[in-house]
Amino acid sequence: MQRNNFTEVIEFVFLGFSSFGKHQITLFVVFLTIYILTLAGNIIIVTITHIDHHLHTPMYFFLSMLASSETVYTLVIVPRMLSSLIFYNLPISLAGCATQMFFFVTLATNNCFLLTAMGYDRYVAICNPLRYTIIMSKGMCALLVCGSLGTGLVMAVLHVPAMFHLPFCGTVVEHFFCDIYPVMKLSCVDTTVNEIINYGVSSFVILVPIGLIFISYVLIVSSILKIVSTEGQKKAFATCASHLTVVIVHYGCASIAYLKPKSESSVEKDLLLSVTYTIITPLLNPVVYSLRNKEVKDALCRAVGRNTS
């Protein structure tokens, strides 16, 4: 592709929440508060699952991996977004934008497949309890985690170099971070191939995990309904409730954001959706798993009691 006919763009500026005018300071305070709570919550989960031997199980291993991934995920996006709310027209270099997008795609994909691994873990625990420790061995858990991260890296390698091989004419990104579509819109040339790659990657990353999780929960519900005691059914449902809550919010927002027709896109709606899956969902994980999960709450109490004694 020839670049000689285009002025070389070396940096971008985020439009972000500039349309909110005077409310940007309020947004800064709100987002900063959520960011601090998200980091604190996820770090607490990682720490608790590491130090409390009662939580040394596959379920909490996956939870700690998800919390770690969500921590880095927010570090990649939120600090830059907060800076843009305070310092207007703060530029980001082309290399910086590519780096942010690479980590975003990698970690977003990793999170999707980690949630799938957690769904599989719940399926094995409920449908094959006698073989649970054999199936969900340390090797299998490591394989699922590495597979999730590896898939994320492959998706990023497919996506990001193809995106930044394009020549850009515009410099104003109608977003608060280097997301795929807003950056693609700045290209001077036809982006049909890139759009096909993006839609293919998005469909794979969203629909494959949704399908696998759906199958897992169909089998889980089928097994739960066979449990004779009502108490046993309640306990089984309770173990899945936290995961299912996070899955619905996570994939619901991601599906609307990346699989909707281009004709239905608008800057305001896209910003709102992006806030949900980049800021709200990472906070949802520690809140849901700590408030709804008795084992995590007990582990927190033990840790607090140990430190105060």
Swiss-Prot record:
GO terms for cellular component: endoplasmic reticulum membrane; membrane; plasma membrane. It is found in: Cell membrane. One of its GO terms (molecular function) is olfactory receptor activity. Pfam families: 7tm_4. Disulfide bonds join 97-178. Residues 1-27, 79-84, 153-203, 257-270 are extracellular. It is a multi-pass membrane protein. Gene3D superfamilies: Rhodopsin 7-helix transmembrane proteins. One of its GO terms (biological process) is G protein-coupled receptor signaling pathway, coupled to cyclic nucleotide second messenger. Its main location: membrane. Residues 49-57, 106-131, 225-235, 292-309 are cytoplasmic. The chain crosses the membrane at residues 28-48, 58-78, 85-105, 132-152, 204-224, 236-256, 271-291. PROSITE patterns: G_PROTEIN_RECEP_F1_2. Keywords: Angiogenesis, Cell membrane, Chemotaxis, Disulfide bond, G-protein coupled receptor, Membrane, Myogenesis, Olfaction, Receptor, Sensory transduction, Transducer, Transmembrane, Transmembrane helix. Olfactory receptor. Activated by the synthetic floral odorant, lyral, and by alpha-cedrene, a sesquiterpene constituent of cedarwood oil. Its activation increases intracellular Ca(2+). Acts as a key regulator of myogenesis through its actions on cell migration and adhesion by activating the Ca(2+)-dependent AKT signal transduction pathway. Also acts as a regulator of angiogenesis. Moreover, plays a role in the regulation of lipid accumulation in hepatocytes via the cAMP-PKA pathway. Involved in sperm chemotaxis and motility. This is Olfactory receptor 10J5. The lineage of its organism: Eukaryota, Metazoa, Chordata, Craniata, Vertebrata.
